[in-house]
Amino acid sequence: MAATVATVAYLGLEARSVEVQVQLTSGVPRFTIVGLPDKAVAESRERVRAALAAIGLALPPKVITVNLSPADLPKEGSHYDLPIALCLLAAIGATDAESLSHYVAVGELCLDGRITASPGVLLAALHASGSDKGLICPAAQGSEASWAGELDVIAAPDLLALLAHLKGTSLVSPPPPVEAEPPEGGPDLAQVKGQEVAKRALEIAAAGGHNLLMSGPPGAGKSLLAACLPGILPPLQPGEALEVSMVASVAGELGGGKIRRKRPFRSPHHSASMPALVGGGLRVRPGEISLAHLGVLFLDELPEFQRPVLDSLRQPLETGSVSVARANTHVTFPARVQLVAAMNPCRCGHLGDPALACSRAPRCAADYQARVSGPLLDRIDLHVEVPGVSAADLTLPPPAEGSAEVARRVAAARQVQADRYNGHGPRTNAEANGEMLDRFATPDEPGRKLLADAAAAMRLSARGFHRVLRVSRTIADLAGADRVGRIHVAEALSYRRQAPRN
C-alpha cells in the first residue's frame, strides 16, 4: 500500500514542492524516514505515532517507509508532521487519498493529536494558491493562510476534527483574514526638546529612506529620536505588507495570523552575533536585517558591535538582500532596510565637553571611532551631531510641531517619489540607481558647481557622491521643488560630515 501528500520545503522566502510518500510492506516492523530529513523531521516518527494513538489508531505492524521527495532537497522543520500523518492515514485507509491530493499540508503535531503552529504557513499558502491547491494547516494559523487570496483553507485544531472534515461529517469553518491591530503609539517628536538639526535630519531620512548616524554624548536624546522614526514613516502598502509578513512568517513571528501594516523597527543588542544580525544558524533563519525589511534597523552604541558583524551589513545595505551560503544550500532573504545608528564620540561619551573633559582625548575618540569601518560609514547618507541638552532647553514648553505634522510632509514626499519612479523599480530616492539619479536628481548649474567643488574638497567617493545626490533629491521633494538646486545640495553636503579620524 502506498500514498502521497503534498507539502513544502522553505528556502529563504521560497516554498518548494515536496511530496510525502508512504509505503507499507511486509517485514519486521519499523518506521523509517528518508529524503535528507533533519533532526526535527526524524523525530516526527514519535510525534506521529503518539498522535495517531491518541485518536485511537495504531500503526500497522509493517515496514513503514516515508520518503520526502525530491531526495536531494534538505528538509527542515516540524511542519512535516501533519503531511506524514495524513499520508499514513491514507495508506491504512483511514481517509480518502484522492481528497488529500487537492491540498498542501503543513503543521506540527502534539502527542495528544492537536495540530500546532509552525513557521512559514503564509509561504505555504501562497505556494498552494499558485499550484491551484488548497491548504491544510493549524487552526491557529488559518487567518494567516487566508491572506494568500482565493484559497480553500482547512484550519483544523486536531487530527480528529480534520478527519471529520475530510469525511464530510463535521466541517471546519473557513478562517477569516485578520489584520494587525494598530500598535500602541510610540514616542512623539513633540517630546524631544531642542535638537532641531537632528529632527530635520530624521525627517529627511524618513522622507527618502536614507541611512542615518547620530553621534553625541549620553543622554542627548539619540535613542529617543530613533524611537520617534516609526511614527513619521508612512504605513506599508499592500504589496509591501505581504513582503514583510512573509519574512515574519518564515521566522515564526507572525502572531495570530495578523498581516503587518506598520513598518518594522528592530533594535538588536550590541552583543548580537553575525547570524543573529544577517541570518544563518544551524537551521537557516532570517536575521535582524531581514526582519527589518522595508522598515528600520536601529543599532544603538554602534562601535560596541563586533567589527566583523558590522562589516557584514555592507553588502545588504547596497543590494537590499542578504545571501546565506551553506554546504548543501544557498538561501537569500530580502533586506531593504533603513539603517539608523547612534554612537558616543568616545568611550566615556564626553569628548569636547569642557565640564566633563575626557581624560584620554583625543586618543580615546580616535580608537573608539575606528571600530566602525570607513566603508560602512560611507554607506550612511546622513551624519548628524546630537549635542547635549541644557537645563534651559529642558524647561522650555513642548515644541509646537509633533510627529503628526512631520509625518504629513514625509507622506507627501514619498508620494512624489512613488509617482516619479512608477514603473522604474525604486520606491524611494535611497533606492535610485545611477541612471535614475542622472535623470531625476541632476542639480542646476549652481548646484552642480557646488557639488563638484565639495566632492574634490571632501574627497567624496563615487558612492558618497551619489548619496549626496539622493539626499539632495529628497530635500528638494520636501521643499516641493521640481529641480534640485544649490540650496538642496548645500544642505545635503552638510550631512556628509564623518567622525574625526587621525
Residue ranges and their predicted role:
Residues M1-L213, P217-S223, A325, F465, ...:
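Peripheral, non-AAA+ core regions of ATP-driven protein-machinery
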Residues A3, V18, A42-A54, I84-A90, ...:
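Solvent-exposed alpha-helical segments within well-ordered globular domains of core cellular machineries
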Residues T25, G56-L59, D96-E98, A128-G130, ...:
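Conserved catalytic network of the ASCE P-loop NTPase/AAA+ motor domain
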Residues V34, A40-R45, P60, N67-G77, ...:
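Basic, amphipathic alpha-helical bundle interface domains used for macromolecular binding and assembly
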Residues K167-I204, G208, P238-I289:
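P-loop NTPase nucleotide-binding/switch module
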Residues M214-L254:
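Walker A/P-loop
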Residues L294, D300-E301, S312:
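Walker B catalytic acidic pair
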